[in-house]
Amino acid sequence: MLKNKTRAEKYQTYYTTNEYQIVKEKLPDIIRDAEIKASEVLEPTIYEKRAIMEVIKDFIRDHQRKVYGGTALNEALKQVNPKDAIYDNYSFSDIEFYSPTPVQDLVDLCNILYRKGYKFVQGKDAQHEETYSIFVNFQLYCDITYSPTRVFYGIKTIEIDGINYTDPHFMLIDYLRMVNQPLTAAGQRWEKAFERMYRLLKDYPIEDFDKRLDIPEPPEEIQSYISRIKTEFLSDNKLNESFLISGIEAYNFYIRHAASSKDEEQMARTNRNVVNLNNFIANVPFSELISVNYREDVKNTYNFLRMIVEDKEKISVDEYFPLFQFTGYSTVIKYDDHPIIRIYEGDGYCIPNVKTVKTVENDNGTKTKYEYKYVSFQYVLMILYINKFRAHLDKNKPMYFNYGIAISNLVKARNIYLDQTGKSVLDNTVFKEFRTNCTGNTISFTRMNRLRLLEKRKQGKQTSFVYTPEDFFKKDLETQAKLDPSKARFKNTSGNKIMVPKYLLFKIDNNGNIEDNIHSEEAEISEKEETSGGSSISTDKSFEESPNSSPNSSPNNSLNNSIDISTNNYDDRSENSLDSLTSD
């Protein structure tokens, strides 16, 4: 009988440590070679993509649209340092541009591509609200984003090869918006945003001004009210949960913090020998607060001010539409026509901030503790850029330049502080970037998009738009004639003062009391109203090209009639509804 023998198990190495390092080093180049080969043979090939992209670029040139996003950054970087470009000849990226008439542009551009013989041409809603995508042969080629006429003509650009690309520092606002949304953007966007922001600021650095802000001091009475908002009104712990200090007051907070550090007069990053940071402190023209409980906080603030002002009859309230994608609604409360406070709607966002505690000794020897929340350094930097843009739209030259100086001073103070303390931008100081602690409730973009579609469906509104030229041109001429892209409606995000009562969020009764306007309607504007409103561009080159403010329009009721103009859905991201825009 044979004896059972147990064989000793032996193992062998497949990759040595040295081989692992070699593969890690060389694999990216091998992958890149494979991607280039794939782009040349897989449909749609890189050659087809390039040809289609040239058609789109010609459209952008002819219609003077404004390109933003990755393509705009790539072209701007190439002008300064081609090595900093984020794309190469074999990298393909869709192109994004702003338009005051995005639906009309979508239809026209789809028709051009279809008539040139390209297959599977389709335009449809993108995932971002008021943005539309064009696909050709199942490939995404461009996103067209609605921009109010007033905003569109106010966007500064650089022209390259006949195409207007958004100014790099206008692009910076978008990157700052990403880093100021820690709960919804960190996982997917922060790494890319930081890399792009680094290259942008390296090639297009922030201008260094040697000036103080020239903001007039408000009347003493207004200063008193501004101070009491902070020391009395915001001392309420409940309000502290929903209010964040922003604007020039937040700017002063960071300047003072940098000035309190030792040896603040020595500056390594700014290449200057002497500076007194206390000179950067600016007059606060009015308080600026961001509220994550907007409606209640506006009413509470108004009621507080009515209690402390000398003459209640002199209080007034102005409301403003959201400014593009940058801010929500805002309310300015004035006394004797002098602004005391501007409150911005921050609902739906979790806003990064710095919490502070200040103890003050009272006359009777007792001590009072004040706790405040200031928006984070990166957030106030973003707000200064947005306010600078708003001042440009409003043709407010003094404040336009003041905000430019404030941006310069804020960055300078931060650099001084970090150099002299030996801290980094990620160390736990008030200048810490990429903060994850935030105030406010938010939801993911995908969830918000789905909830928005559900709400539209409940209201009987059109939930999606798909345009396929191949299907459209098969219809009879009478049906074709009903298509009217100019009936597309968009939210009023002009940033203008709200003049029509039915669009106001608040109502002041005959006794001066404030309440919600329960009959408030959401203001919309059509493409036809955008184009008929007109705009003119200032020739004052000492400032910037700037449009005249377009008047607020009173839109008609939303379009109810619709027809199908597509029987094919070339992308599964959209809803099943294929409603269109038609003439009555």
Swiss-Prot record:
GO biological process: mRNA processing
Gene Ontology CC terms: virion component
Any GO MF annotation of the entry: poly(A) RNA polymerase activity
Biased composition (Low complexity): 546-569
InterPro entries: APMV_polyA_pol_cat_2nd, PolyA_pol_cat_su
Region annotation Disordered: where it falls in the sequence: 522-584
Top-level taxon of origin: Viruses
Catalytic activity annotation: RNA(n) + ATP = RNA(n)-3'-adenine ribonucleotide + diphosphate
Record keywords, A-Z: ATP-binding, mRNA processing, Nucleotide-binding, Transcription, Transferase, Virion
Subcellular location: Virion
Biased composition (Basic and acidic residues): 522-531
EC number(s) on file: 2.7.7.19
Root EC class: transferase
Purpose of the protein: Polymerase that creates the 3'-poly(A) tail of mRNA's.
Similarity remark: Belongs to the poxviridae poly(A) polymerase catalytic subunit family. Highly divergent.
Protein name per the record: Putative poly(A) polymerase catalytic subunit
